[in-house]
Amino acid sequence: MQLGMIGLGRMGANMTKRLEDHGLDLKTYDPKVDSTASTLEELRDQLDAPRTFWMMVPAGEITEQTFQTLLDLAERGDVIVDGGNSNFRDSQRRCREAKQRGIGFVDCGTSGGIWGLSVGYCLMVGGEDDAVAQAEPAFIALAPDDGYAHVGGPGAGHFTKMVHNGIEYGLMQAYAEGFEVMEKSEFDLDLHEIAGIWRYGSVVRSWLLELLHAAFEKEGTDLEKIHGYVEDSGEGRWTIAEAIAEDVPVPVISAALFARFASRQDESFAAKVTAALRNQFGGHAVKAVQTAEAATQDPR
């Protein structure tokens, strides 16, 4: 099978290597690194019809621009796969737009990160049967045994990956809170050792726990060189928004997202308001902000 890979970042480059290792003929395009094609048009011309293109670019504007360009370049019978973290509503729309031109569209939720090259990628695939079938040799090559499924129609792949990432937020937050309780305890606990033994036979064993054990090994258990500032890439927000639309309570995922928001605050205005209110209604003491001038005054 021939495949046109668009985007050779960490994920795209590793996926390209895994596909080639499994015997696929890869043509590539990335304006920032060496690739077989210098333009998307040249990439199209390097592939035999019917073509399969795989977009592995950042979600949002770049994905939309790439998709629209491919729509103009592709021919009837070609298939476009989006392996990034696009919003499933955008994927449904893109499938409709592609179908109007006789072009297939497949949304593929991809999990595995930088480890996927060696162990394979979990693939959650959405799309119509004929389009999925055309791209299936690539899915089989990329995934480990039992790690790929056609989960539903257009949008279903990215919807499933969205929820996957929402769950991931909750799992990481639970580990983070538990290890902080242990770190603050009266016991001199070796967190690296505990993360290690929990990997074997424990109810809470997981790949995330293995990664945490590796992080403690690399960074030390105090993590003193890491600032506790946590970004989010959007999927947690989308999961919560969809849960609200479906009247589904998701308190754990919501709390995990809000904890990330809190991690980015140098000072919480909400906490200031609460402190001010307690002072007003009960005369409770407040802790004054120490200004730079006050900090440099002679304490005598």
Q: What do these predicted ranges mean?
A:
Residues 1-51, 73-77, 114-116, 279:
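NAD(P)+-binding Rossmann beta1-loop-alpha1 motif at the extreme N-terminus of oxidoreductases
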Residues 22, 101, 246:
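Conserved dinucleotide-binding and phosphotransfer motif residues
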Residues 26, 104-106, 250:
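Hydrophobic beta-strand scaffold residues
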Residues 40-106:
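Rossmann-fold NAD(P) dinucleotide-binding segment
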Residues 66, 87-177, 185:
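Rossmann-fold dinucleotide-binding core
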Residues 134, 155-284:
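Helical "substrate-binding/catalytic lid" subdomain
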